[in-house]
């Protein structure tokens, strides 16, 4: 709509009127009322297209014929109002149709409406009826149409029948069953725009008072100045459309930025949670390391209190110069076997602590693989797991050892009371009696036989307990074939199998001779009493035969004689300790009981309490 259209309408309205001077004021009033009432619309549409329109406006303004005294037309035009915004009408229809009574409804007096559940209102109503993504945007839109939230005190919110979380809004023209009041609800005008309209209204009033007076010679000048003022405060429709599109684009970008900001906030919270978890893990790891260090210090203190010196390694310049050739540094301390000592049973204890190897030095497993183990060692395997028995027996036979198997601690004690072995592999967790308690009882009558613990519990406190019960070393489960070979090399490489050790001479003292069977003077003769004390054949006990080797009949005879000597020697040794064992049997049920039995330590036994260093490799024992 332009000024030419307005003037043409004015001419049409006044075309049938007389040229009465009183009509000038009525026409001016009519024009002023229309401009005042439709000011916002005029400012959007009053931009002329070219200079010819401007001249047309000025000419029409100067040639207006003022009708005489028909004021009803003015009042009729003043009563026409633009339709209300669709936003308000949608909200009114929802409330009138009562489509969501559990979410939004009229109040009892009908002068306001209340949102009962903002969450359901956001998820059910906004996506289907409005262009708002959240409830806050909907509230801002209500404020633009001069809706106000009804404020309540905390006490009133608690007593409110609609709930404490309800939102109540009101507008003087927005009431139940009052549809005609919607035309009076319009968007609020911004402050800057109000100022411009005030200037336009002043100009129009001045135009009504001065510009339409025919006696005023400066009327045309006032008309021109008023038109210029109005046009300077308006924009073209195209410019307004471009501005509106830019605003919509900015609004979309703002919404996208909000969504991205929310997603970034969520990711930041996740990262913060992960960071806190990592910090807690590091703190826990630090605590565990401190506990391990304290336990290690306790272990070193315990070893020092028991007379075992722990070497202290300095820097690279103060290390043992032979560290490149020796894989371990051995510190041996032998206590005096004094009967007046508080501890009745003493033995030789040696501690092997690994030295830091040089880059060119061989690993312990590689060095152990180069050492050949003598054949003929007799090993007692105390294990209750069938798979471990099968695999361990297979490895022991491969290394030339004979194996006897028992499945619990009590059987191990009974077997060690009757027979002697070069080495004992003792499991810890077994039925009837555990391995640690069984070892402490065995040490009451046998301090010579090396006993190796086979266990998966390798905590520092457990290792200290095993060593205190008399075990020499620990073979940590799961272990490999090389780990088992390393243990055998460590304890048997410098020993002579019991079956090959020399028997007591024939011309011994009468007392010794009386305790020795006369048939033992001939190594090739086996006494029936000695055979009765020999261990029965076990399915797991076999004589090792090297694969691929050709054994003649003479070798078979010689091997049988060596086995007979081994068995006779076992019988003789156990006969000598029979009386001491009988006294210790009464204390079998009491673990860690000290007995006054002094046994001469074996000179060739290298008892080495050492922490397990096995590595999980192929052929593991579970």
UniProtKB/Swiss-Prot annotation:
Which residues lie in Low complexity bias regions? 13-27, 512-527, 555-578
Which parts of the sequence are annotated with region: Hydrophobic repeat HR-A/B?
Answer: 212-303
- Family matches, as PROSITE patterns: HSF_DOMAIN (PS00434), RESPONSE_REGULATORY (PS50110)
The UniProt entry, under SUPFAM superfamilies, shows:
CheY-like, Winged helix' DNA-binding domain
Q: What start-end ranges are recorded for coiled-coil regions in this protein? A: 240-260
Q: Where is the Response regulatory domain?
A: 378-492
Q: Which domain of life is it from?
A: Eukaryota
Segments carrying the region annotation (DNA-binding domain) are 84-190
| Compositional bias per record (Polar residues), positions renumbered to this chain | 1-12, 537-554, 600-622
Q: Which residues carry this modification: 4-aspartylphosphate?
A: 427
Region annotation Disordered: residue ranges? 1-29, 501-579, 599-622
Q: What's this chain's function?
A: Transcription factor that is part of a SLN1-YPD1-SKN7 two-component regulatory system, which controls gene expression in response to changes in the osmolarity of the extracellular environment. Under low osmotic conditions, phosphorylated and activated by the phosphorelay intermediate protein YPD1. Also activated in response to oxidative stress, independent on the two-component regulatory system. Regulates heat shock genes in response to oxidative stress and genes involved in cell wall integrity in response to osmotic changes.
Q: State the name under which the record lists this protein.
A: Transcription factor SKN7
Q: Which gene encodes it?
A: SKN7
């Amino acid at each position: 709509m332009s000024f030419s259209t307005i003037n043409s309408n004015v001419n049409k309205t006044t075309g049938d009127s007389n040229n009465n001077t009183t009509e000038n004021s009525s026409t001016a009033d009519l024009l002023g009322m229309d401009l005042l009432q439709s000011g916002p619309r005029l400012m959007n549409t009053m931009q002329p297209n070219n200079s010819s329109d401007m001249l047309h406006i000025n000419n029409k303004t100067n040639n207006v014929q003022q009708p005489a005294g028909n004021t009803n037309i003015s009042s009729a035009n003043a009563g026409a109002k633009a339709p209300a915004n669709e936003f308000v009408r949608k909200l009114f229809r929802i409330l009138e149709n009562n489509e969501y009574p559990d979410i939004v409804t009229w109040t009892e007096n009908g002068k306001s409406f209340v949102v009962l559940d903002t969450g359901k209102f956001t998820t059910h109503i906004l996506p289907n009826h409005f262009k708002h993504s959240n409830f806050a945007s909907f509230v801002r839109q209500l404020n633009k149409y001069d809706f106000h939230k009804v404020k309540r005190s905390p006490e009133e919110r608690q007593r409110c029948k609609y709930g404490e979380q309800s939102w109540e809004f009101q507008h003087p023209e927005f009431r139940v069953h009052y549809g005609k009041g919607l035309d009076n609800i319009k968007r609020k005008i911004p402050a800057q725009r109000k100022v411009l309209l005030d200037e336009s209204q002043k100009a129009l009033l001045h135009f009504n008072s001065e510009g339409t007076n025919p006696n005023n010679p400066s009327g045309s000048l006032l008309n021109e100045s008023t038109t210029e003022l109005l046009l300077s405060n308006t924009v073209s429709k195209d410019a307004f459309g471009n501005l509106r599109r830019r605003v919509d684009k900015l609004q979309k970008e703002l919404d996208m930025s909000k969504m991205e900001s929310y997603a970034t906030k969520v990711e930041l919270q996740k990262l913060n949670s992960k960071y806190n978890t990592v910090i807690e893990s590091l703190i826990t790891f630090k605590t565990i390391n401190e506990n391990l260090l304290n336990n290690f210090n306790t272990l070193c203190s315990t070893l020092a209190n028991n007379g075992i010196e722990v070497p202290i390694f300095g820097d690279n310049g103060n290390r043992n110069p032979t560290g490149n050739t020796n894989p371990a540094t051995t510190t041996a301390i032998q206590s005096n076997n004094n009967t007046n000592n508080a501890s009745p049973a003493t033995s030789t204890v040696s501690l092997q602590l690994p030295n830091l190897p040089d880059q060119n030095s061989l690993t312990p497993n590689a060095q152990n693989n180069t050492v050949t183990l003598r054949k003929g060692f007799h090993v007692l395997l105390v294990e209750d797991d069938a798979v471990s028995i099968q695999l361990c027996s297979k490895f022991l036979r491969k290394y030339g050892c004979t194996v006897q198997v028992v499945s619990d601690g009590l059987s191990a004690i009974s077997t060690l009371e009757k027979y002697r072995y070069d080495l004992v592999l003792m499991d810890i967790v077994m039925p009837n009696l555990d391995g640690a308690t069984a070892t402490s009882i065995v040490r009451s009558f046998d301090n010579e036989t090396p006993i190796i613990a086979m266990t998966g519990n390798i905590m520092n406190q457990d290792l200290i307990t095993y060593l205190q019960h008399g075990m020499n070393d620990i073979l940590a489960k799961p272990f490999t074939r090389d780990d088992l070979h390393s243990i055998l090399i460590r304890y048997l490489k410098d020993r002579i199998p019991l079956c090959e050790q020399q028997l007591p001479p024939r011309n011994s003292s009468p007392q010794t001779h009386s305790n020795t069977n006369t048939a033992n003077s001939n190594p090739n003769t086996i006494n029936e009493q000695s055979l009765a004390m020999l261990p029965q054949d076990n399915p797991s006990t076999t004589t090792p035969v090297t694969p691929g080797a050709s054994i003649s009949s003479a070798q078979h005879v010689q091997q049988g004689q060596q086995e007979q000597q081994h068995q006779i020697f076992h019988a003789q040794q156990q006969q000598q300790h029979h009386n001491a064992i009988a006294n210790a049997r009464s204390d079998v049920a009491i673990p860690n009981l000290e007995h006054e039995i002094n046994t001469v330590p074996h000179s060739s036994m290298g008892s080495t309490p050492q922490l397990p260093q096995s590595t999980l490799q192929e052929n593991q024992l579970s």
